[in-house]
Amino acid sequence: IGKSTALSIIAGEKQPNFGDHEASGFQELAQRYKGTEAQAFFTALADEEINVALKPQHVDVIPDAYDGTVKALLQRVDERDAYDTVIDGLSLGHVESRNIDDLSGGELQRVAIAATVVKDADLYLFDEPTSYLDIKQRVEVSAFIRSLADEDHAVMVIEHDLIILDYLTDLVNVVYGESGAYGVVSMAETTKKGINTYLDGYLAEENVQFRKSSIEFEERSEKRYTKPDVITSWPAFTHEYDTFSLEAGTGTIYEDDIIGVLGENGIGKSTLMEVLSGEIAKDFDMDEVTMSHKPQHLDADDTLVRLYLDGAKQHKHTVID
């Protein structure tokens, strides 16, 4: 609905076209908002009097654009001698000598944030900065991003995690609309009010109902009263790599189970899933059961969605994490 597009315009990477499908430029934008703070901002942006740094949404494409170590990349884009600060603040010391292509999703995300922060900017924009991060890393990254804001610098963030949004921001703009068709940005509200407005689906000040029903978090009812059938189980096992070892205890999955696997990044959660699904060879037997596994990292190509899904149906163990 346009959140990333809006950030790209604020960053000066895209120019608004006002529905004419041709870029009209920031001067026209400034004229349309004459007498407002928006006019002052976009005039300064057009005159290059404001420096803006943007962390893009998709960090998985970084290895396609850059081949080298984390240290070399960050030192190349560092405009304010902040290398040591971002390495310490984002806990990147253990990966600074590694190649970009060898990083996990969470490590790539923090490197992308670091590459944005070392820019000499007045305004820092972060598009979904906590994707791929575990809970501990989300809190750490949020505190680091929040520390950037002072009397000379501002921060704007696109974030879907409402808890992190509450922790990170002072003001919130609610964006509503229809995916792929249009988007509307509300006026700014305090964070608490903005989050409640989003959950309610109704903008009182603008008298706009953008969702038919509110989002409510209900208490969970008690589960089963009868003992369900076992779907599958496994014994305790160990899986080792050259520099990493996963130790897993015995486990059982029953009908009607929804099981969460919770833990920090890089400690073997995906390996556990891959062993149980049969994608990694295991030295123990499990009850024969059909499994469907969505992997953590996706490789996009030009295959049509319908053809991809038709092909996936042909496999007993569907790999779609």
What are the language-model segments listed below?
Residues 123-125:
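Walker B motif beta-strand of ABC-family P-loop ATPases
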